[in-house]
Amino acid sequence: MSKNERRTFLLDFEKPLWELEARIEQIRHLAEENNVDVSEQIAQLESRAQNLRQEIFSSLTPSQRLQLARHPRRPSTLDYIQSIADEWFELHGDRGGYDDPALVGGVARLGGRPVVILGHQKGRDTKDNVARNFGMPAPGGYRKAIRLMEHANQFSMPILTFIDTPGAWAGVDAEKLGQGEAIAFNLRQMFSFDVPIICTVIGEGGSGGALGIGVGDKLMMLEHAVYTVATPEACAAILWKDAKKSSQAAVALKITAKDLKELGIIDTIIPEPSGAAHVNPLEAAAILKETLVNNLEELSNLTPEERKTLRYEKFRQIGVFLESDSNLALHS
């Protein structure tokens, strides 16, 4: 991401760091123009910037992580595919007359291994987001996804899914076309597949829209991704009749990778580059690729029956809670 883009999409909590980095660049430029050696001062300022970056990103609130997950320049499914896949051939259509641009997928080669990759796809600007329906798939998108996954299962190719959606499309037409049935069918079928399945939340994992491609042997999240039953804004509006309490809802919902790892819902937190994935997309992709390759190798050592049994047990263990604790979280 260029400096101008970063400044355009600067988040409030990033401003102190941006101002310090801009000051460093200004001093460096003036020193070069006047042939003055300020290397010692620059080193001190860069050390301060590094410490400030560490301080900011080690103490992010759930709401701030949500801002990072929704960042307009955060790498998307297609961005990651283009960076990690040795070969990639996109497949289209649900064979029912619909090709949903909000959910993309195809055949790829990862680390020398043929795989099927699919995921939600948001847009880069307003026009692109409208075309992609802001990453909210219609029923045809989930039917396209299951078609590709059945293809993968038939030809013994592992399945990799990238989750990045505020939720499935909730329009009247989506309900008429069977949104609930399409997602439910995917859930059932994904439990039955023989091949390894790895699901990764790369940005925003929202509600049933995320679950529709979220059943796997491994569920992973990027460090600053979020995964939630409902957006904090929607949760606040429902519980407190006030969307402005979204920050409070974000805490209660336990949406961060750290929270979900502690709750046993996800298996792995994938670290992001300093400053988050949008600052250095290539490094983020390299870390993601290494993690996927290693986990695929591990899962390939299991038999299909072992994988399906562990997959079933993994999801059966999700959802145990104490009512008193949940009430405390809602009223705190």
Curated annotation (Swiss-Prot):
One of its GO terms (molecular function) is acetyl-CoA carboxylase activity. It catalyses: N(6)-carboxybiotinyl-L-lysyl-[protein] + acetyl-CoA = N(6)-biotinyl-L-lysyl-[protein] + malonyl-CoA. The keyword Membrane does not apply. Its EC number is 2.1.3.15. Pathway: Lipid metabolism; malonyl-CoA biosynthesis; malonyl-CoA from acetyl-CoA: step 1/1. Its main location: cytoplasm. It is found in: Cytoplasm. Residues 44-298 form the CoA carboxyltransferase C-terminal domain. GO terms for biological process: fatty acid biosynthetic process; malonyl-CoA biosynthetic process. InterPro entries: Acetyl_CoA_COase_a_su (IPR001095), ClpP/crotonase-like_dom_sf (IPR029045), COA_CT_C (IPR011763). It comes from the Bacteria. GO terms for cellular component: acetyl-CoA carboxylase complex. Keywords: ATP-binding, Cytoplasm, Fatty acid biosynthesis, Fatty acid metabolism, Lipid biosynthesis, Lipid metabolism, Nucleotide-binding, Transferase. PROSITE patterns: COA_CT_CTER. The keyword ATP-binding applies. Belongs to the AccA family. Acetyl-CoA carboxylase is a heterohexamer composed of biotin carboxyl carrier protein (AccB), biotin carboxylase (AccC) and two subunits each of ACCase subunit alpha (AccA) and ACCase subunit beta (AccD). Component of the acetyl coenzyme A carboxylase (ACC) complex. First, biotin carboxylase catalyzes the carboxylation of biotin on its carrier protein (BCCP) and then the CO(2) group is transferred by the carboxyltransferase to acetyl-CoA to form malonyl-CoA. This is Acetyl-coenzyme A carboxylase carboxyl transferase subunit alpha. It comes from Crocosphaera subtropica (strain ATCC 51142 / BH68). The gene is accA.
